[in-house]
């Protein structure tokens, strides 16, 4: 079996697994890992097929979750950004006893827009899939640019994301298509109502991929969960607002310790 790239760092007494989003790799967390490493034992992961976890083809959401969970500590907080939020959610549903808390960042249990659901239009996701086969590099860059659009530091943040992608091996087109297929088809809205553990959802108000309307809808659907919206952030709040982002995680850790 191919190996998943996994790095453990930090000296905190609380394990925190960090899962990145589509097209990227674990280097996205470098802007906050130093700050968090004195409070958590961090588990930095390249999802199967991404970055240094080469040798995988397109996977289903369940397959990806099972592969990542097989390497994880017995108990941890699971944090997933964007596509990684779906993977973390699937782990929480499949192995709830191993998840101390679920944190989703700029993520949705259903990314695709529907008649009564805000999300990414189906034709946009299909367009990205089609464009991947025509101009691989440009399609990835376009998707990255969408993630920072609207913020005060949009260009700078987009450059950070691009450098992260280029610093490690690129995922293959089949892996990227598989990830887009998960974003098109996954719908965990009903399944996540069964999750009984702590659930923190973090959003950027300027996010053009996961609209802020999603936060309010999920507040109603998951009344025991908590949500926080970073007012001037877009799809990558940990890059544009690292201090506030870390504060939210430290506050969660404190709440868990006082349970």
Curated annotation (Swiss-Prot):
Functional pathway: Cofactor biosynthesis; biotin biosynthesis
Coiled coil: none
Reactions catalysed, as given in the entry: 6-carboxyhexanoyl-[ACP] methyl ester + H2O = 6-carboxyhexanoyl-[ACP] + methanol + H(+)
Domain AB hydrolase-1: 15-242
GO biological process, one term: biotin biosynthetic process
Enzyme category, top tier: hydrolase
Main subcellular localisation: cytoplasm
Molecular function GO labels: pimelyl-[acyl-carrier protein] methyl ester esterase activity
Listed InterPro entries: AB_hydrolase_1, AB_hydrolase_fold, BioH, Carboxylesterase_BioH
GO cellular component: cytoplasm
Residues binding substrate: 22, 82-83, 143-147, 235
Localization terms from the record: Cytoplasm
Active site, UniProt feature: 82, 207, 235
Function: The physiological role of BioH is to remove the methyl group introduced by BioC when the pimeloyl moiety is complete. It allows to synthesize pimeloyl-ACP via the fatty acid synthetic pathway through the hydrolysis of the ester bonds of pimeloyl-ACP esters.
Record's subunit section: Monomer.
Family annotation (NCBIfam families): bioH, PRK10349.1
Family: Belongs to the AB hydrolase superfamily. Carboxylesterase BioH family.
Record-given protein name: Pimeloyl-[acyl-carrier protein] methyl ester esterase
Gene name per UniProt: bioH
